[in-house]
Amino acid sequence: MTVRVVSLVPSATETLLAWDVVPAACTRFCEQPLLPHVGGTKDPDVQAIAALRPDLVVVDREENRKEDAEALAAMGVPLHVMNVTSLQAVPGELHALAGAVGVNMPPVTLPPARADRGTAVAMIWRRPWMALGADTYGASVLRHIGLAHVAAEGDDRYPEVDLADVARRKPDVVVLPSEPYPFAERHREEIAAKVPNAHVVLVDGRDLVWWGSRSGAAVQRLGSVMDGLRGARPPQ
């Protein structure tokens, strides 16, 4: 069957395309310039989406706002709601999405979990500094490649942190993804100066926080980055 889909989730858009399902529209953050855009993940144009008469709109509990999902539902637009909070949740969530769009899902193959590689903090924002919390997809990826995440205690999924506190935790690695904040070399140098004895590494943010068809290869790539740090001294 052919399902007319609008995806408001960048990870889902990438996954659908990998399955040869071309969305009728997506968000401007999906990095698909050839597809029509219907706003952003937090500010979708619900009227434009409804006008497309989709069979299904893919949303995510964390990525998208509840009020936008409710507005679409009130207009009679069918929703497929995803909630991926860990690497282990990916196969089940993708199986449900594949069923909703009528495709046979390719198997999700993850590399074996790795032994202890030390500790890490993964930053996601600057001004204020924010890090991944323990109960997030990205933190579960780090655990899978052998890095215990030590950003902060508590239930906050994206806690505010200060670099002095990060330094006190003495992480072996500080991970700087290219999104949602576009960390670059100048930020790496800034953090390296304040968190001595840690490797501060820039990584493709999609590999850390986008789940879906890329998950297996993303875990492999991130593991390879960490392998490259073995035996290397942190830059001073």
Residue ranges and their predicted role:
Residues 1-236:
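N-terminal ligand-binding lobe of clamshell/alpha-beta domains
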